[in-house]
């Protein structure tokens, strides 16, 4: 199935010059969303995943159905102040400043094999920070899966040494 035909390109969103890749037009078609999810599940099965991790918010949209299909748990990565219990945190650079991602301190057990999921790989900053959180907790990043990779932003370079699946490249 050609998944690209189900992604809507929205010019100048959220600001002029950006060609936003809208995945809601993929997700609102059950058979297409299922197909995309199944592709990631197949990839994850080969990796013997113990838990799926995804950054808010669209990492949840991809990761939760994958975790469900695999029969494993899902651990959210959230911005600072959004998780109610003790967390580990990592600060990471943005184009104009810094941001912080957090994860519950007990979300990953040492040695667990982790699949990280997100909707889109752009610069790689968010996923690099997510990897740092997983590894701080002793998890092993067995794979990283995206619906979309924006190749011209070269985010894959920040993730060298990790196994990556991108279902579509733009």
UniProtKB/Swiss-Prot annotation:
GO cellular component: cytoplasm
Keyword Cell division among record annotations: no
GO molecular function, one term: adenine phosphoribosyltransferase activity
Pathway: Purine metabolism; AMP biosynthesis via salvage pathway; AMP from adenine: step 1/1
CDD domains associated with the record: PRTases_typeI
InterPro entries: Ade_phspho_trans (IPR005764), PRibTrfase_dom (IPR000836), PRTase-like (IPR029057), UPRTase/APRTase (IPR050054)
Entry's EC annotation: 2.4.2.7
This protein's record includes keyword Mitochondrion: no
Main location group: cytoplasm
Subcellular location: Cytoplasm
Record key words, sorted: Cytoplasm, Glycosyltransferase, Purine salvage, Transferase
A biological process from GO: AMP salvage
Pfam families named among the record's database cross-references: Pribosyltran (PF00156)
Catalytic reaction(s) noted: AMP + diphosphate = 5-phospho-alpha-D-ribose 1-diphosphate + adenine
Family matches, as Gene3D superfamilies: 3.40.50.2020
Subunit structure: Homodimer.
Protein task: Catalyzes a salvage reaction resulting in the formation of AMP, that is energically less costly than de novo synthesis.
PANTHER family: ADENINE PHOSPHORIBOSYLTRANSFERASE
Family stated for the protein in its record: Belongs to the purine/pyrimidine phosphoribosyltransferase family.
NCBIfam families registered for this protein in UniProt: apt, PRK02304.1-2, PRK02304.1-3, PRK02304.1-5
Record's protein name: Adenine phosphoribosyltransferase
Organism of origin: Geobacillus sp. (strain WCH70)
């Amino acid at each position: 199935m050609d998944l690209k035909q189900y992604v809507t390109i929205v010019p100048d969103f959220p600001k002029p010059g950006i060609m936003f890749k809208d995945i809601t037009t993929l997700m609102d078609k059950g058979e297409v969303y299922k197909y995309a999810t199944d592709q990631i599940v197949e990839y994850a099965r080969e990796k013997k995943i113990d838990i799926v991790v995804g950054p808010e918010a669209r990492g949840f949209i991809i990761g939760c159905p994958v975790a469900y299909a695999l029969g494993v748990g899902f651990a959210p990565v959230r911005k600072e102040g959004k998780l109610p219990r003790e967390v580990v945190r990592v600060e990471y650079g943005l184009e104009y400043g810094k941001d912080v991602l957090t994860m519950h301190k007990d979300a990953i057990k040492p040695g667990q094999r982790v699949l990280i999921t997100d909707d889109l790989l752009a610069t790689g900053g968010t996923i690099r920070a997510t990897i740092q959180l997983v590894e701080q907790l002793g998890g092993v990043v067995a794979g990283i899966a995206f619906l979309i990779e924006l190749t011209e932003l070269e985010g894959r370079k920040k993730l060298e040494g990790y196994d990556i699946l991108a279902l579509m490249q733009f």
